[in-house]
């Protein structure tokens, strides 16, 4: 029998979180059995939820209060968690994250292949943070004329400004700071993807884990920067093991980062 949607936007419900989606949302059900998807919730949480979106068969909610925290919950250590579209499990322990992903593999094999097979436990990373060897940072100018740099928000092209990421090497933080200072000092124009005007599109950084070498690349909607020598000298002064500085030209109207 099809469930009748009885929930309305701005309703408040207390639910238990019993599952997790592939995007890291906790899943609970109303007394009528209607599924409610809730960011920043973990299996085992009992939460007071504000309904923010109602669809035909399910709803989305926002945690207003954690009435009883899950044993898998941990303190969030990222200041842009839930704004940035990068991480969805910072509020759960790493062991819990591995179990969630293991279960998703089991569910996919059962649903798609119709097989009930043994899945070995996921082998976790020795160091779950600071492991990335590449980052690509989009840039914008805010209404005050200041350069913002960071990551796209979840399911959007809205840039979430940040000066760090817990998944990247610490040296990337310093590269971001040097480049942002250069852009502010030289007043370079920043690319606007809606108008296709402005010069600087992305900062692209690579790191060699074994060598410690760093490559810095600016992707631009043109051929050159105002003062490339100033940028190179600033990077050389502040970034140990700087191996190369690259200017990549991408003049296309595209979401592809490099040209």
Description of each model-found segment:
Residues 2-259:
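Accessory RNA-recognition modules of RNA-modification enzymes
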């Amino acid at each position: 029998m099809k469930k009748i949607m009885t929930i309305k936007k701005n309703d408040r419900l207390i639910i238990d979180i019993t599952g997790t989606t592939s995007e890291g949302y906790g899943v609970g059900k109303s007394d009528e059995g209607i599924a409610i998807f809730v960011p920043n919730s973990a299996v085992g949480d009992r939460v007071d939820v504000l309904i923010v979106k109602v669809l035909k068969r399910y709803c989305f909610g926002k945690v207003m209060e954690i009435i009883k925290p899950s044993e898998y919950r941990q303190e969030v250590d990222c200041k842009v968690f839930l704004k940035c579209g990068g991480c969805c499990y910072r509020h759960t322990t790493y062991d819990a994250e591995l179990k969630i992903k293991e279960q998703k593999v089991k569910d996919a094999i059962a649903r798609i292949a119709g097989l009930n097979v043994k899945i070995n436990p996921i082998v976790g990373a020795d160091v779950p943070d600071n492991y990335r060897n590449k980052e690509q940072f989009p840039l914008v100018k805010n209404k005050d004329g200041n350069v913002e740099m960071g990551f796209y928000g979840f399911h959007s092209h809205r840039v979430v400004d940040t000066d760090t990421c817990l998944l990247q090497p610490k040296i990337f933080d310093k590269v971001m700071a040097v480049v942002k200072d250069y852009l502010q000092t030289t007043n370079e124009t920043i690319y606007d993807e809606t108008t296709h005007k402005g010069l600087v599109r992305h900062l692209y950084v690579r790191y060699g884990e074994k060598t410690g070498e760093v490559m810095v690349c600016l992707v631009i909607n043109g051929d050159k920067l105002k003062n490339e020598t100033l940028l190179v000298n600033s990077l050389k002064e502040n970034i140990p093991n700087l191996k190369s500085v690259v200017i990549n030209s991408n003049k296309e109207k595209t979401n592809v980062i490099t040209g």
